[in-house]
Amino acid sequence: MNRLSKEQQVQVVAALVEGNSIRATVRLTGVAKNTVVKLLLDLADVCAAYHDKIVRNLRVRRLQCDEIWQYVGAKAKNVSLEKKAIGWGDVWTRTALDADTKLCVSYLVGGRDLGWAKEFMEDCASRIRNRVQITTDGHKAYLEAVENAFGADIDYAQLQKIYGAVNENETRYSPARCIGCDMKVVSGDPDPKHVSTSFVERQNLSMRMSIRRFTRLTNAFSKKIENHAAAVALWFMYYNFCRVHQTLRVTPAMESGIADHVWSIEEMCTLLPMEGSATKKADKALLLKALGGDDSRQAVVPF
């Protein structure tokens, strides 16, 4: 990446956020594989730190939360204890979406247990300044996590999908057909008309189509948890600040008031410290500190 021009950086990032794998990006741009990965990791660091600093003090009326599954290295049932220790196995990306502005308020790459749910909801609560209506799926961990983060100052409902019977002799990859939904009011007085996870589930689909690592039934899955988390951080920066939403006609960041123009991918790349600088590592550490992170991927891209 030391010799990449700004134009080459833009080409690489554009390929990555539009559904191309690392190797496909190499073929499209002519940039070496290790250079592509290094650019992904370095840019993801500062993008995650920028999101953490800027996406705060939001006025949100309706928040939809969901999680999307993928795996690193292999599915959990096929992972040895040795590989599990380095991050292989099932991994969940939790997402909180503002139903009005379509802004991704918070995201977290990690497990699906209560500890991760609490961390996710606490992060959501720290970014919102008003009483909010939240809808999640029926995952039990959210019951305690939401109460722990928001207390009683919330209107919260769960939407539990009801699936049809599955033929025992039928092999399926996807869940059975959804035949209905059951709404459960957990706290406060949520408006039944707005108890929904449709927008955040549609955002999950955008992730599946735009991040190659999330594509089902391929060998494009992540081999390292660090690269997986970096791809998510890069995508959400692009989604919030660069990608014009079809129904809004502006970016989610503009609609929510935290940006005043559509970012270009080149503008994203300018977040990186200047290439070729003898003090690049120090520059990066100072930049991350200014943005609210530090020189550690674990701190700015939790996984």
Please give the residue ranges for each predicted region.
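Residue-level recognition of single "structural anchor" positions
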Residues: 1-303
